[in-house]
Curated annotation (Swiss-Prot):
The keyword Magnesium does not apply. InterPro entries: NA-bd_OB-fold, Rib_uL2_dom2, Ribosomal_uL2, Ribosomal_uL2_bac/org-type, Ribosomal_uL2_C, Ribosomal_uL2_CS, Ribosomal_uL2_dom3, Ribosomal_uL2_RNA-bd_dom. Part of the 50S ribosomal subunit. Forms a bridge to the 30S subunit in the 70S ribosome. The gene is rplB. Residues 1-37, 228-294 are annotated as: Disordered. Residues 23-37 have a biased composition (Basic and acidic residues). One of its GO terms (molecular function) is transferase activity. One of the primary rRNA binding proteins. Required for association of the 30S and 50S subunits to form the 70S ribosome, for tRNA binding and peptide bond formation. It has been suggested to have peptidyltransferase activity; this is somewhat controversial. Makes several contacts with the 16S rRNA in the 70S ribosome. Residues 264-285 have a biased composition (Basic residues). Signal peptide: none annotated. HAMAP family: Ribosomal_uL2_B. One of its GO terms (biological process) is translation. GO terms for cellular component: large ribosomal subunit. This is Large ribosomal subunit protein uL2.
Length: 294
């Protein structure tokens, strides 16, 4: 994948960069194939609201209309080879997806690993060959391998390492658990029977793209964010004052008065703390209370 820089023929394109989409499939006329119709689904967009219509996540709404692509995160079609037919753009995620047609005729979308080509054969299962795009239990993957789409619980489907360019490394194996170094730097123990897909995800330059203008964020469904310091006191604890006034508190707070910007919100006695070997923040081993051990 490459990044194309636009000429500044308008102020908004001066700093705008776009992907050249070289990884995506095209037909003989240079056009992208249409998505598989049987794997498309309309999903009501929440716009940051809950079931009562109350805003629970600010700065969400609008954006271009999308159809959801049904992705096979479980990779539960075991022992049946499939052929990669296309590599496609997915508006619902940063990673690309590829359409796989299995020998029994079924078609599924999976996340597209880096360097997986059209025409490649993939498979899922304990006896699958060690190749990019194949899914197998973590206990059968050699140490040092980069994986993605990692399950946290057996059979639930991949829940971690699904963003563009992401990859987790298998660093240790102890008993029935396998330790993974996640993209955040955290080292976490996961059961060996959980499945993961071999390889790093494609579209690795996604984080280097500059949107260039506010309107491009609106296309993605991101609404403007207003700083609390420019609001009135009735709207935010940081608001009010003459001119550019300081916060006036010992720590920044949310619009509802709770500490923020560095304040830890994870529960100290969360049961899954015992599976975190090294935290992503301090780097130390966590004790039962979730604190980094000295």
């Amino acid at each position: 994948m490459g990044i194309r820089t636009l000429r500044p023929y308008t102020p908004s394109t001066r700093h705008m960069t776009v992907s050249d989409f070289e990884e995506l499939s095209r037909d003989e006329n240079g056009k992208r194939p249409r998505p598989e119709k049987s794997l498309l689904q309309f999903i009501h967009r929440k716009k940051g609201r809950n079931n009562r219509g109350v805003i629970t996540c600010r700065h969400r709404g609008g954006g271009h209309k999308r159809l959801y692509r049904i992705i096979d995160f479980r990779r539960d079609k075991r022992g049946i080879p499939g052929t990669v037919k296309t590599v496609e753009y997915d508006p619902n995620r940063s990673a690309h997806i590829c359409l796989v047609e299995y020998e029994d005729g079924e078609k599924r979308y999976i996340l597209a690993p880096r360097n997986l080509q059209v025409g490649s054969t993939i498979m899922a299962g304990p006896e699958a060959p060690f190749e990019i795009g194949n899914a197998m239990p973590l206990e059968r993957i050699p140490l040092g391998t980069v994986v993605h789409n990692v399950e946290l619980y057996p059979g639930r489907g991949g829940q971690m390492v699904r963003a563009a360019g992401a990859g987790a490394q298998v660093v240790a194996r102890e008993g029935k658990y396998v330790s993974l170094k996640l993209p955040s730097g955290e080292v976490r123990m996961i059961r060996g029977e959980c499945y993961a897909t071999i390889g790093q995800l494609g579209n690795v330059d996604h984080n280097n793209i500059s949107l260039g203008k506010a309107g491009r964020s609106r296309w993605l469904g991101r609404r403007p964010k207003v700083r609390g310091s420019v609001m009135n006191p009735v709207d935010h604890p940081h608001g009010g004052g003459e001119g550019r006034a300081p916060i006036g508190r010992s720590t920044p707070v949310t619009p509802w008065g709770k500490p923020t910007l560095g304040y830890k919100t994870r529960k100290r006695n969360k049961p899954s703390n015992k599976f975190i070997v090294r935290g992503r923040r301090r780097g130390g081993r966590r004790d039962k209370g979730g604190r980094a051990a000295q």
